[in-house]
Amino acid sequence: MGIGNAIVIGGGIGGLAAAAALSRRGMAVTLLEQAPAITEVGAGLQISPNGLAVLRAMGLDAKLTERAAVRGQAVVLQDHKAGARVARLDLMRGQGAYPYVFVHRADLVDILLGAAKRGNVTVELGAEVAEVTPGATPQLRLSNGSRRRAELIVDASGIHSRARAVLNGADQAKFTGQVAWRAVVRNDFNHPDEAHVTMGPGRHLVSYPLRGGRLVNLVAVEERDSWAAEGWNHADDPANLRKAFADFGGRAAAMINAVEACTLWGLHLHPVAQTWHQGGVVLLGDAAHPTLPFLAQGANMALEDAWVLADSVLNHPAEQALARYQNLRQPRVTRVVKAAAGNAARYHLRPGPLRSAAHLGLKLGSTLAPWAMVGAFNWLYHHDVTAPK
């Protein structure tokens, strides 16, 4: 017998996508969000073809156009001193029906919230979950003492997930020795419809346009020994960002100098959870597999999770459905997490023979065999979880 009702914990991208995907299959869904409103800080997202496949299957791709999401043309790798191009990877090559887009996080959250509401999802705000208990009928306790039960509880509340700790024990996060700043500035720099990775020794800057090219999203990563807290809501003085990237030149320097407000967070490496489900409780998104930002796949993996979970629940008995979900998702997200963790080292090479050789190899590869460089990511971008199996 199928699952008829569910509680989803967390009003971020993964939670909203899961609520919308489950409700569109006829399930009664309640979404619990601890904040007083479902809002997002100003930041951008890169939605690659694999994530867009999910949004398209949910009938939401046109909403991205309405919100002036930018279709990405390329990823450009460049040197930090003056912005000299090292390599250009064409994102328009071989993408088929699914383009690569840059979207404001708040816009995607609003799109998914609208889809959830159209599916008659009940949204409860200010609902902080204090405890999750798996069982024949799983239940949770809110911080105000009230209890809720459902046939399925989906924990999509991120790295501080209550259910992750219940199913897997204490987290074993490790500080990577890297911190990241986030900021959004006006596009007064003629930034093209491309994602730029400006590479310097021990640091790199990612930039891409948002909202029809009116804004530019910045993510600046620096290697350092000192620890910083996880989560991107920790405000920092833009002067610290400018000091860390003082030797960057060209457009990168101009954009950094334009930052008026930024957040800073420490990058921690988390293992992919070994156990994703137990007694009607299941993990989704960062609650199951937090990933570093160096492959821009956090939101895309959450969208894939949401679709596969909903599809599994629709077509299989409860415990079989959750086991199928984990079996399909765990190997893929493990590969993504490992690939993301390896990218920072490639961006942060110090001056010397290795850096020169690496940059020369990138330049030659993107010039002589660009299709091969782009094709190296086919396993990631051309994976469509919505395709009939």
Regions found by a protein language model. Name each.
Residues M1-G4, E66, A82, L295-A296, ...:
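C-terminal helical "tail/cap" subdomain of flavin- and related membrane-associated enzymes
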Residues G2-A6, S23, S48-V184, D225-R242, ...:
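Conserved N-terminal helical subregion
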Residues N5, A28, R214-L218:
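Residues at the starts of beta-strands that form the adenosine-phosphate
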Residues G11-R24, A28, L32-A35, V154-D155, ...:
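Conserved mid-domain beta->alpha element of the FAD-binding
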Residues E33-P36, D90-G96, E223-W227, A306, ...:
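Short glycine/proline- and charge-enriched loop/turn segments
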Residues A62, G83, N187-P192, G213, ...:
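Short helix-loop capping/hinge motifs at secondary-structure junctions, enriched
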Residues A195-A228, P238-N240, F245-A246, G250:
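Active-site substrate-recognition segment that forms the wall
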Residues G231-T263, A318, Q326:
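Flavin-binding catalytic cores
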